[in-house]
């Protein structure tokens, strides 16, 4: 569903910007296929400024459909969105994007990369980053971005446990809105406070007690 390496390249080198709106975007009513088929019924979700949402559900339940609609609405609302797909179609392109950045901006991204456990100097001289290195580099770019929203689809793919723990800390410090698709329960518990559960053609909204920021 994501054509996001273009989005990623455009987002690199910026920092979080608060749009000032309390509700960034809403999705309400039925979500239909172009042919008219109802894919999700009676949806009623709103992403608020600074809200941290996990989108959960079985494979094929409609998570990608909900995210596609959410991203379209965010685009219509002119929100700056940082997006990480489940898989990067061209990991080497991420590295090339970083190499072409202004030195000050590149330094900021590489500094964030170091906090994710990667030696920036080693990555910059490689011919082709590993899947894990490319993913961390993409995450470093997004975490250094001017974005009011991060949308991350299975960000722990290709990451080892220490890297996942560093990502948990980085997302806990992120002060924009976050929409996270993950099967990693520890990451979800550390980074999100609300769950949008997609099942049986519907979206159930649940406030997750005991998570950060939840009474």
Where are the regions a protein language model picked out?
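Coiled-coil termination/hinge junctions
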Residues: 1-26
């Amino acid at each position: 569903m994501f054509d996001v390496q273009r989005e990623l390249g455009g987002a690199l080198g910026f920092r979080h910007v608060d749009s000032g709106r309390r509700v960034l975007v809403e999705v309400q009513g039925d979500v239909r296929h172009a042919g008219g088929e109802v894919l999700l019924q009676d949806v009623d979700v709103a992403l608020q400024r600074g809200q941290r949402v996990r989108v959960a559900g079985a494979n094929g339940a409609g998570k990608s459909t909900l995210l596609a609609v959410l991203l379209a609405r965010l685009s219509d609302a002119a929100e700056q969105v940082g997006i990480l797909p489940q898989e990067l179609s061209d990991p080497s392109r991420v590295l090339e994007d970083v190499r072409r950045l202004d030195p000050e901006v590149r330094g900021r991204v590489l500094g964030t990369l170091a906090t994710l456990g990667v030696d920036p100097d080693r990555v910059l001289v490689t011919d082709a980053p590993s899947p894990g290195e490319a993913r961390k580099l993409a995450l470093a770019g997004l975490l250094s971005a001017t974005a009011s929203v991060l949308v991350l689809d299975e960000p722990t793919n290709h990451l080892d446990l220490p890297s996942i723990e560093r990502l948990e800390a980085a997302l806990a410090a992120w002060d924009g809105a976050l929409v996270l698709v993950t099967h990693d329960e520890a990451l979800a518990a550390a980074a999100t406070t609300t769950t949008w559960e997609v099942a049986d053609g519907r979206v159930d909204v649940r406030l997750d007690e005991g998570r950060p920021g939840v009474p």
